[in-house]
């Protein structure tokens, strides 16, 4: 009986610890994955060229695959 109580209490404590740390790291984990992907993409041995974005007001086009820093208005053909 004592062993069962100790087991239940320990499971509850571990669950509470996981829930409290999960809230703190929710956004940080996403940023870590983004940084890891960018680091891999921009490394010299990846075989990929680093992407540069086109600034606001510059021309963008679907066919040329221009990459705007924010968003491309394809109707007007400019980065917004």
UniProtKB/Swiss-Prot annotation:
Disulfide bonds join 53-69, 60-72, 68-79. Keywords: Disulfide bond, Ion channel impairing toxin, Knottin, Neurotoxin, Secreted, Signal, Toxin. Its main location: secreted. One of its GO terms (cellular component) is extracellular region. Pfam families: Conotoxin. This is Conotoxin Bu3. Residues 1-22 form the signal peptide. Expressed by the venom duct. Residues 23-51 form a propeptide. It comes from the Eukaryota. Belongs to the conotoxin O1 superfamily. It is found in: Secreted. The presence of a 'disulfide through disulfide knot' structurally defines this protein as a knottin. The cysteine framework is VI/VII (C-C-CC-C-C). GO terms for molecular function: ion channel inhibitor activity; toxin activity.
